[in-house]
């Protein structure tokens, strides 16, 4: 996971 919580929560995909 390079995006982290910010990128993950924004896209909504694991």
From Swiss-Prot:
Annotated GO CC locations: cytoplasm
Known EC number: 1.2.1.12
Top-level taxon of origin: Bacteria
Other comment: Under acid-stress, this protein is expressed at a higher level in wild-type B.cereus than in the acid-sensitive mutant strain NB1.
Sections of the chain in a coiled coil: none
Biological role: Catalyzes the oxidative phosphorylation of glyceraldehyde 3-phosphate (G3P) to 1,3-bisphosphoglycerate (BPG) using the cofactor NAD. The first reaction step involves the formation of a hemiacetal intermediate between G3P and a cysteine residue, and this hemiacetal intermediate is then oxidized to a thioester, with concomitant reduction of NAD to NADH. The reduced NADH is then exchanged with the second NAD, and the thioester is attacked by a nucleophilic inorganic phosphate to produce BPG.
Keyword Coiled coil: no
Subunit structure comment from the entry: Homotetramer.
Pathway: Carbohydrate degradation; glycolysis; pyruvate from D-glyceraldehyde 3-phosphate: step 1/5
Protein's UniProt keywords contain NAD: yes
Top enzyme category: oxidoreductase
Residues annotated for NAD(+) binding in this entry: 10-11
Name the UniProt record assigns to this protein: Glyceraldehyde-3-phosphate dehydrogenase 2
GO BP annotation list: glycolytic process
Keywords: Cytoplasm, Glycolysis, NAD, Nucleotide-binding, Oxidoreductase
Subcellular locations according to the entry: Cytoplasm
Family under the similarity heading: Belongs to the glyceraldehyde-3-phosphate dehydrogenase family.
Protein's organism: Bacillus cereus
Gene Ontology MF term list: glyceraldehyde-3-phosphate dehydrogenase (NAD+) (phosphorylating) activity; NAD binding
Catalytic activity: D-glyceraldehyde 3-phosphate + phosphate + NAD(+) = (2R)-3-phospho-glyceroyl phosphate + NADH + H(+)
